[in-house]
Amino acid sequence: MVKALMVQGTASDAGKSIIAAGLCRIFKQDGLEVVPFKSQNMALNSFITKKGDEMGRAQVVQAEAAGKEPDVRMNPVLLKPTSDRKSQVVFLGRVLRDMDAVEYHEYKQQLLPKIKEVYDELGAENDIIVIEGAGSPAEINLNDRDIVNMGMAKLVDAPVILVADIDKGGVFASIYGTIELMPPEDRKRIKGVIINKFRGDVALLQSGIDMIEELTQVPVIGVVPYAQLDIDSEDSVALVQKSRRFDSRKSLDIAVVSLKRLSNFTDFHSLEIQPDVSVRYVQPGDAIGRPDLLILPGSKNTIEDMNYLCESGLEAEILECLEQGVRIFGICGGYQLLGQKISDPLHLESDLEETRGLGILETETVLQPVKRTTQVRALHEGQELEGYEIHMGETQLADRLEPFSIIKEQNGEATERPDGAVAYGGQVQGTYLHGVFDNLEWTRQYLNELRLAKGLEPLEDQLVSIKDFKDREYDKLADVLRQSLDMEQIYQIINREEK
């Protein structure tokens, strides 16, 4: 039977995902075949596998840390909020339907047999599975039908480590409260506690650690410092923490419009790590100003976000940027927003039949019930690009518009179809390709065009590979965890040797 270790947290954003990723990296470094698993994830940032399956980004990060190709079995259930009340339910990479919280709470138990089946498949292929929970295991109003915290731990008989965030304050109360709210059989599964995001002298914590160990009878197996790491996050909390101001030490100012239903903000990580680029996220009340590049990102609800742009005043600022000659780039939902009209005849996103777009591109989009999920290779001005598509709309271009690229391969099969649009002599571009800025040479060429436009010399040898960058960050994360966790005790927990 495969060995397992489950990482749960006292709350959302306690650091479960990053701790799980770091453990995956450590086990890989130690020569073990390790794979991540999260039965149910809620996020707007998603990824398309080579087979065309949609999954959560956190498990993609963990898979990369483990040295494994992302596989939808690592995240069988993905919930993508479409409004404040509903989420799109994606199961094993494919859309089931939209459900509200009550409907999904009643339905999700039906998914357990298949969740267990794919877990067992991963177990047959690996030495260790690192399982991540969601939110808190002490949500006592939801525990009767839980499939992602203690419900999952019981399903596969996994020992649990509890992660608590000290940065927000009240860490000992959160540890004690979480454990005390559990029924006795669940408490027995908690084999260790990790205090995460600590700043200062660990010695000052010792008396509190001694007391919480006495109260809970659970050992604290590590205190992890607040580390300066740059690792993809799928949590909307991370977006709130991103910069809203231009870093004057950088040459290029790139502004990303923070849509209300913004999705896949990981598209811009490759830009954030470039030495000459400052990426800022514009929210209502912030001035867009005159950036070197304005980006409209992906959206899970383009109709709602068009209304948001109008009501917030951002629409007027975007159109002013167009008049000032600012380069504008739309990705997926952002590309749809640049068009003249978005139609929703089946009411997939709202009660409206249609809404106008920004009217910058001569395009019209019709939302459709079947989601396109593909990994693609495309040609843009003779240059090969790689990316992935996640969208439910089909966009028609006016005859005089040129496409941004030609898709040559999707999910490993040859094809030929246009993608995106280019207008205003290249000033405005739109594409359905997520991850387009991960294409290193094309991105540097694009950034150099922005540099030349403002009288700066191009950078020729400043190529920062997102893959190499990520690998360095995963190794740094593993180093931090090795220095701050009792790895001997963690291995004892995994091997059921704990005292």
From Swiss-Prot:
Q: In which pathway does it act?
A: Cofactor biosynthesis; adenosylcobalamin biosynthesis
**Keywords, comma-separated and alphabetical:** Cobalamin biosynthesis, Glutamine amidotransferase
Query: Is Cytoplasm there in the keyword field?
Result: no
Top-level taxon: Bacteria
Query: What does the record give as the active site?
Result: 332, 434
Q: Does the keyword Mitochondrion apply?
A: no
Family from the record: Belongs to the CobB/CobQ family. CobQ subfamily.
Functional description taken from the UniProt entry: Catalyzes amidations at positions B, D, E, and G on adenosylcobyrinic A,C-diamide. NH(2) groups are provided by glutamine, and one molecule of ATP is hydrogenolyzed for each amidation.
Protein name in UniProt: Cobyric acid synthase
> Which source organism?
Streptococcus sanguinis (strain SK36)
The encoding gene is: cobQ
